[in-house]
Amino acid sequence: KDFNNRKSVLNGVFRHAVLNEIITFSPITDLPCNTLKFKLPNASKKAYTVEERAMLLSYLKTLEQDAYTLAIQFAFYGIFRVGEIKGLTWDTENENIITIKQQLVEERTLQEDMTFSHPHRVLKDPKGNPFYSIRTEELPEAGINILRKMKELNPNGKLVFMHEGRPLTTDTFNRRLKKYCGELGITYLSSHKIRFTNASMLFDAGVKAIDIQPLLGHSNLAMTQHYIGQRTTERDSTEMARILA
């Protein structure tokens, strides 16, 4: 899949070059891809454990609070995409319930010289079918307290999470998260894996997949199945011997 994704990007670039008469033909079409064989990737960790989540939250609370430390904490109290956190706006109707109605993304455009422009921020509908991805989530008290703290730090901002008057960036969010994981000796997983973590914690606690689906903003249950069921507790290596004794 990764190879095909990269091939599609290259194919688009070379096709653009042919259409603009920069080159005469696309070399991608001559690649003998049908004979290629790929080794399956090793299984990778897709979620923080409950213990790692608790360690991160406890540690983050000891730091000087800013929009990034608070946004990382906030991510662990819901099932959000990082772009949805960046695009969150103030809701004065109900403090406990947030409406996820947009995401803030950084986009680049392919220029005539075949280079990409500097990223520019765009507010868009949440990823996927808006009928499902625009949704509400009820927050625990800890999540509400984070919003209250952000209101103190950013009382007049158009967006909830703003750092020094500017919207957050995904790169800085993940760079900070990686830094804090390193300081704790925890394996770093990106912001998107926090979504896996929280969805799996709900599933482990007995919440049905069909009830987790709307919280993730998914249009079908099959997509949700990919997120839930990740390991959030350490495996008991003695379990088999005990059961089969």
Locate the predicted segments by residue:
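DNA/chromatin major-groove-contacting recognition/catalytic segments
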Residues: 111-113, 226-245
